[in-house]
Structure formats: structure tokens, C-alpha cells
Regions:
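Structured soluble/peripheral alpha/beta segments that form catalytic or ligand/cofactor-binding pockets
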Residues: 1-362
Length: 362
């Protein structure tokens, strides 16, 4: 499959081509605040997740400006989601006033109400993040210790002609996670593996982007983070592709030059969208990953989160159809290093966010 490439879309790779011959080191300010909080069409958020022993998965957001379409667009907020081993979920979005928000522009330090995120850095360049989020139903108090140093594709930015920019940095491609959580009135000591990234942009998602798919793969020896972002006709359906590969703590691959194949779409009545049961990511001669969906963890028609009037306008006037999937897949990873091929397997979760119908509706 040949990529659509618009020469007016500028990606921040150091080269040659759409990859990093030199991987730029992350600095503390890369994970600090970038936008003018409250300004129109400026969005920024810090994302954390963790897969915990015992079968729990959690997700936490700190929003300087909430990016999703709806009445909360642009609001300061935090979000807590807990997926339990039995498949049940609690998800809370709590909004705050600007007077309750602080974020440094020099280092990773965010306070929203009583919710906090702060990082420290060791002499060897590995970071430690402490996060705390709480409402009446959920509480997360966690420490993330980096196992792979922070990474960004090129300088982290993609510029979409004169339409705006999108920035993505990954301060914690892979981290050990310890701490405790509260689920209702039940306290749990937890440990597991986690991830943290950070995004900011100056346009509304749906104005340029049709869909994106992203995730991570953690095997015994390798860590991979990827994103495939399909843009619309405004930029000639340009596809932004980013991928990081690390062996142990060493990042050996930072590239947008990979083949991305989606197959065997299945329609979800709940989400009103289809998702691919199989995804293959291939960097010829270097890395290949096959994802086969074993379970749908979340499937959401995002119009269900709108009030009825706004949902009608979004669907029938703006022609928006936002949907979301969190998928659990079995993976096979093949890595070639120094002419030696290694094969490792496991399971992982990955996500799909879309504003158009994917695949064929059956």
C-alpha cells in the first residue's frame, strides 16, 4: 500500500527520509505546558495508563484543554477510568475552573484541583513520575519509573500546511508502576507496567483527522510504541506514521517508514463503527508486529456522551460520527538486530479513535 504524502505537511524527522538518523533527547520542558490555556482551538493533555497485576487496567488524563468534540471541548479537567477483571468499567471526567489549574512551562508539573502530576529525573536520564487523581468513586496514587528513556518522533511536531500543528512526545515509553488505587470503598495495592504520553495541537481533531490507531507492545526484551493517523482530503489524505522500537532500555528505531495493514473488519452495533481484527506493522528488515484481536475491552459511540440536541447536530449537520475502541490483542513480534532475528509473543491493548466509518458495515 502506497502512502499518501502531501508535501505541505511537514513532519519533524531528523532524516534521512521519514525517520530519525539522530534521535533527539527529550528535555523536561518537552513534557511541560505549551498552549495558552483558554485560547480558542488550543488543546493539550497528559495521558497515563497502567496494566496491573490482577487484571485491572487504568487510564488517567490531565487536561489543560479537553480536545474531544462536545460541550466540554476546551475545558480544564481530569479523567479517571478503571477497567476491572470482570469487564465492568467506571469512567469519570471532572471539570475545574482556570483558577484551580497550574502547569509549569519548564518541567512536568501539573496541578488541577487536588490532582497532581510531577516528575523528577535521575542522573542517568531516567524519569520518575508521581500522579494522584481522586473523586468520590475512584482514586489513583501511583509512581511510574522509566524503563525506557523518553522519546519523541523527530522534534515531536507535525505541521499540516497552514491548518495547524499536532505535537506528540512520549516521556515514558515503558515504566514500572507501583502504588495504590481506590475502587469505591475498596483499597488495592497495585503494581504493573505503564505508559505516559503528552499531546498538544491548535486545531479540532475532526477538522483534519479521519481516524487514528495507536498502541504499544511490550515483550520480554522489546518495547514498541506506534501511531497511525489518517488525515482527510484537506491534506490529500496524508498519513502520519510514527514508531519507536527499543531493546531493553536502548531505543534503536524511530521512524515513520513502515507498512501498516488493517484486515478483517468487524462491525460493532454498540460503537456504530467497525474495527480491524488484524493489524500488521512492518519495517522491512528491522521489525514486524502482528496484532490479532482477542477481546474488545471498550466500544463507544461517542455521540452517546453528547446531549440529545448536540448529538443530532453533530450527526446530521456537522456529519460527525465519532467512535472509540480499546482492543486486547495477542501479538507476535519479530525483530532483526545484527542479522539475528528474535521472535517474541504476548498480549497487549491498543486503541482506535475515528470520525468516519471504517471498513464495511455488515
Amino acid at each position: 500500500m502506497t502512502d499518501n504524502v502531501n508535501p505541505n505537511v511537514k513532519e519533524g524527522w531528523t532524516g534521512p527520509g521519514r525517520r530519525d538518523g539522530t534521535i533527539l533527547p527529550m528535555k523536561p520542558e518537552d513534557d511541560a505546558l505549551h498552549i495558552d490555556v483558554g485560547a480558542k482551538n488550543q488543546f493539550e493533555w497528559w495521558y497515563f495508563d497502567a496494566t496491573l497485576e490482577g487484571g485491572y487496567t487504568l487510564v488517567a488524563f490531565f487536561y489543560a484543554a479537553y480536545p474531544n468534540p462536545g460541550l466540554d471541548t476546551g475545558k480544564i479537567a481530569v479523567e479517571l477510568t478503571l477497567l476491572r477483571p470482570d469487564g465492568t468499567k467506571t469512567q469519570k471526567v471532572i471539570k475545574y475552573k482556570k483558577s484551580q489549574f497550574f502547569a509549569s512551562k519548564e518541567e512536568p508539573h501539573v496541578t488541577i484541583g487536588s490532582n497532581t502530576m510531577k516528575a523528577t529525573f535521575t542522573e542517568d536520564g531516567f524519569s520518575i513520575y508521581e500522579i494522584f487523581l481522586e473523586d468520590e468513586d475512584l482514586m489513583f496514587e501511583l509512581t511510574y519509573k522509566a524503563q525506557v528513556k523518553g522519546w519523541m518522533p523527530g522534534d515531536g511536531y507535525s505541521y499540516f500546511a497552514n491548518l495547524g500543528y499536532f505535537a506528540w512526545v512520549v516521556p515514558l515509553p515503558r515504566a514500572s508502576v507501583t502504588g495504590h488505587i481506590r475502587d469505591g470503598d475498596k483499597m488495592l495495592d497495585v503494581s504493573g507496567v505503564g505508559y505516559h504520553d503528552h499531546n498538544w495541537l491548535d486545531f479540532s481533531f475532526q477538522s483534519i483527522i479521519e481516524y487514528w490507531m495507536w498502541g504499544r507492545v511490550y515483550s520480554e526484551n522489546y518495547s514498541v510504541a506506534y501511531a497511525f493517523i489518517q488525515c482527510n482530503e484537506k491534506v490529500d489524505r496524508h498519513a502520519v506514521k510514527v514508531l519507536m522500537g527499543a531493546k531493553g532500555s536502548e531505543i534503536f528505531l524511530s521512524s515513520g517508514e513502515y507498512e501498516f495493514t488493517q484486515e478483517d473488519f468487524v462491525y460493532s452495533e454498540v460503537a456504530g463503527h467497525s474495527y480491524p481484527q488484524s493489524i500488521t506493522i512492518n519495517v522491512p528488515g528491522e521489525l514486524e508486529i502482528k496484532l490479532d484481536v482477542a477481546k474488545v475491552l471498550e466500544q463507544v459511540n461517542m455521540l452517546d456522551n453528547f446531549n440529545p440536541v448536540l448529538a443530532f447536530l453533530a450527526k446530521n449537520v456537522l456529519r460527525l460520527k465519532p467512535g472509540y475502541f480499546r482492543l486486547k490483542s495477542d501479538f507476535t513480534l519479530k525483530a532483526t538486530r545484527d542479522q539475528l532475528e528474535t521472535v517474541e509473543t504476548g498480549s497487549t491493548s491498543h486503541e482506535v479513535v475515528t470520525f468516519k466509518q471504517l471498513g464495511a458495515r455488515e
